[in-house]
């Protein structure tokens, strides 16, 4: 995994951890796909999922937008998924 991918995963962790009531249960997994894109999977305590999603999905959309912007600076595609 490249430094950029690690930086984006750390960005996700720094954005998600302050949002939740159970920060010890935040898990960020990143995997480089065959096409070179990055898949980031966010796992949180089930009670915290709503906080990460936000009203009408605004929070998770904002996280996805930031990650895509960070990846596009280096010509890389980034997908962010919240796993329940």
Cite the ranges covered by each PLM segment.
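RNA-contacting regions in translation and RNA-metabolism proteins
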Residues: 1-49, 62-84
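Glycine-centered tight-turn and secondary-structure capping sites
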Residues: 53-57
């Amino acid at each position: 995994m490249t430094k950029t991918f690690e930086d984006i995963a750390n960005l996700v962790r720094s954005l998600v951890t302050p949002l939740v009531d159970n920060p010890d249960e935040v898990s960020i997994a990143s995997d480089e796909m065959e096409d070179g894109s990055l898949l980031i999977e966010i796992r949180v305590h089930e009670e915290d999922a709503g906080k990460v999603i936000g009203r009408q999905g605004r929070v998770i959309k904002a996280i996805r937008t930031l990650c895509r912007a960070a990846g596009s600076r280096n010509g890389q595609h980034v997908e962010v998924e919240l796993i329940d």
